[in-house]
Amino acid sequence: MSGWRKIYYKLLNLPLKLLVKSKVIPADPVVELGLDPSRPILYVLPYNSQADLLTLRAKCLALGLPDPSQSFEFNGVELPSHVFINDGPRVFRYYVPKQKSVKLFHDYLDLHRANPDLDVQMVPVSVMFGRSPGREGHSQATPHLRLLNGIEKFFAVLWLGRDSFVRFSSPVSLRYMATEHGTDKTIAHKLARVARMHFSRQRLAAVGPRLPVRQELFNKLLDSKAIKKAVDDEARSKKISHEKAQQNAIALMEEIAADFSYEAVRLSDRVLSWTWNRLYQGINVHNAERVRQLAQDGHGIVYVPCHRSHMDYLLLSYVLYHQGLVPPHIAAGINLNFWPAGPIFRRLGAFFIRRTFKGNKLYSTIFREYLGELFARGYSVEYFMEGGRSRTGRLLEPKTGTLAMTIQAMLRGGTRPITLVPIYVGYEHVMEVGTYAKELRGAVKEKEGFMQMVRGLRKLRNLGQGYVNFGEPLPLTTYLNQHVPQWRDAIDPIEAQRPSWLTPTVQDISMDIMVRINNSAAANAMNLCSTALLASRQRSLTREQMQEQLDCYLQLLRQVPYHKDITVPKKTADELLEHALSMNKFEVEKDSIGDIIILPREQAVLMTYYRNNIQHLLVLPSLIASIVIHHRRITLAEVVRQIALIYPLLQSELFLHYSKEQLPGVLETLANELVQQQLLCSRDGELAINPPRIRTLQLLSAGVRETLQRYAITLSLLCANPEINRGTLEKESRNMAQRLSVLHGINAPEFFDKAVFSTLVATLRTEGYITDSAEAAQGDIVAIYNILGDLITPEVRLTIESASSSAEMEAESQAVEETTQE
């Protein structure tokens, strides 16, 4: 680099250091993209901009990557380490210098042809200042989406320097290009052309399509044939004028539609960045690259997260924005449309949805058409398939209405492929968890409002870590092609279609999405420590026992991972325990022997929420441990047989991904891991307990204890009264569970949750154990109950069976009474 250029860079660097604070995407490109800092890199930038180059240089030096401003020398040949695809405009538009990118690509390819050992990494990098997509109807493109001259760039850096990012893309091996495609000038031209297309798609993925003018959007919706027909029906059914019906339609659009504002997003990003840094010790994001690739490939993206907290709305938009993606339009419950939250959420992309559409055809038509318009325009959308926040920490049964509308939007004949992206959201502290416990105990849900929001904000402190894991995407077109090959026959651009295959397909997709959410779960210090302490009947463990138990969980999750998308802490058991203690949820008592970790009684109910977040990850090893402890010695084949009978119930309740065919192999691998940890012994083809490690094995088995007790309750009632109807079975099961929780100190609110028993009874019906005519397959029911009865304590079994007998006698006396009356 010449002396004059060094001086120029130093002078330009001074204001950039003050004005620019860029975020690197992905956060660690060396690890996430597989960049090799020891090998030479050719950085490819879209525009000729020294500000972009110096911004990139600062980030490269911080990441330990080669300096893009330094020349690359090899065998006496010196070439620049960066290339601009477009030389860019100048203040005087008529002066356009000759492009150098094709020549430089050709020089690099030539160098590879002459030197077989050389392998330069070509890395596309885009530097963006600001991400406003602009409004429809504005003819002038927004500055950062086109090539800027020097003056425009100066003002972009001045105004948007702290809203900028440096986006690294996956490297391309020039050795591979030279070997596979040759080194002539046509390949160099092709590289430049592909790079130009790459950057164009990347910009669109980062900023999204232009935002609509709200009134013009409403006018377009009113002109749609579906809404015109719904307005006519409204006027006729309510006997009002057409103008009044149209005013009703506009009022509903005002209630529903978002009013997205880039400036509001920028401002909220500043506020949230400040807030997260003070409330959270870190936000952990995994697998975001798969979503960035979908956006870049032109997919319409529907984000489908689990719903833990009202914080989800803000956290997900914040994470997506910082991953270089457009914040989505979010379907938010109408209960959040209160001042001042409602207007703020609306400006950040929220559109509001009522709890039910029943009895309001105009509302359902407008909502469906609005959602279809969002997809048609290319906006990403986010909705919570569970319908509401989980009060138990587990995934809820999915509500399928919005998903059905998503598929109906595809049936309008759009060309953009729509892909569902499941997201696992996890926290070490959920601010509403105390309220959830009260609601599960029967308290009335408090209505959202300004004062409740203020009270909630006062509780925000020491929230630990947050986790956002992007699961495996589900492309709807691919899914429908595989499962409903004739789906395109139902395409109609005007009328909303409800083909016969829609309802079962939507149900299957929704269950698949819930499974994929659980496949990307995040284990953390809080849910692992809660699992260990709640496994102890006294809710207390010595520090040594706690560390040993955490080690057991960590080894299981690392050696036999539930799924490739789950995340497991890299910290040791001791480090996780120290972090959990810093959250002030547990107490430590010291005596002459050592420390005792205690979960206070008032905290125990709340901690079940965090345990339930990851219960599905450990339920099978827990079940193996429980069976071996009861039998003392048992063959693996018998363990597999017993679990295979119980597994369908667990699979439905916890959205487990293993098929029945995969189950034996998975159980064998888990059993081998327990033997490896010396929790079990393997002798003469049998599994047996290892007495020195029995305490750890007992704590592991306790993870499934309450689940087995619940199953035993329902199956005991079925054994006692095979003709009991589904509604009564659910009600009696809940009543007995409440009784059991009082008599045996079961301190988990979800133990008698209505939704849990509803799912259980529905699964028994699906598996053929009961029918719609309220008949039970008695032999099968008794076989499963005998297995469950052996795995619960004699005291609990006695309580269940005596209560079942009482329920049976009551049912018989009621039947006799009804017969007498007849």
Swiss-Prot record:
Localization (cell): Cell inner membrane
Enzyme Commission code(s) on record: 2.3.1.15
Membrane topology value: Peripheral membrane protein
Catalytic activity: sn-glycerol 3-phosphate + an acyl-CoA = a 1-acyl-sn-glycero-3-phosphate + CoA
EC supergroup of this enzyme: transferase
Span(s) of short sequence motif HXXXXD motif: 306-311
Keywords, alphabetical: Acyltransferase, Cell inner membrane, Cell membrane, Lipid biosynthesis, Lipid metabolism, Membrane, Phospholipid biosynthesis, Phospholipid metabolism, Transferase
GO cellular component assignments: plasma membrane
Pfam family, one: Acyltransferase
One of the protein's GO biological processes: fatty acid metabolic process
Domains (record comment): The HXXXXD motif is essential for acyltransferase activity and may constitute the binding site for the phosphate moiety of the glycerol-3-phosphate.
Name of the protein in question: Glycerol-3-phosphate acyltransferase
The organism of origin for this protein: Pectobacterium carotovorum subsp. carotovorum (strain PC1)
Source lineage: Bacteria, Pseudomonadati, Pseudomonadota, Gammaproteobacteria, Enterobacterales
Gene: plsB
